[in-house]
Amino acid sequence: LLKHTFSQFGVQTTFVDAHNLNEVEGAIKENTKILYLETLGNPNSDIPDLDALISLGHKYGLAVIVDNTFGTPYFIRPLEHGADVVVHSATKFIGGHGTTLGGIIVESGKTNWKTGKFPTLSTSNESYHGVAFADAVPDAAFVTYIRAILLRDQGAAISPFNAWALIQGTETLSLRLERHAYNTKKVVEYL
């Protein structure tokens, strides 16, 4: 996605070792807009220093987007660490049964989208009555833009049945993850 799909839209991605802050900082360029990271890296489940990376991103005026698919909101809450946007693949733990493709985007409401790095959000959008999303909804400019423009133009919306299936998973999320934690503790104690 980041390397191949986004490049088709003119988005360049630089991959770095998230455990090497000097490497991360060295990769930040004048045109860098986003620092994207995972709370639990795939495929190794490595855990980066979330606070240090978020602080570094903000030092350079970047929006920090955290993929919390494997961390889940039950175990890790990136917004409490200062992340600007958190994304989840709802297909995995949130849905809990792997039958439905879906995702979640949560915005902190604290991001200044008017820094000059995000003209899509901070300037007038003629296809939406001239609205500048960062002015009209400063606490939710990113998610409102996605909903008002990207959903309208690209149609990435799940069916009502799939939405229902994901809701079924959220009803047992805390119970399932509590059990995961309990079982993990037992395995660690045994080893």
For the regions a protein language model found, what residue spans apply to each?
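Conserved PLP-enzyme active-site core in the AAT-like
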Residues: 1-191
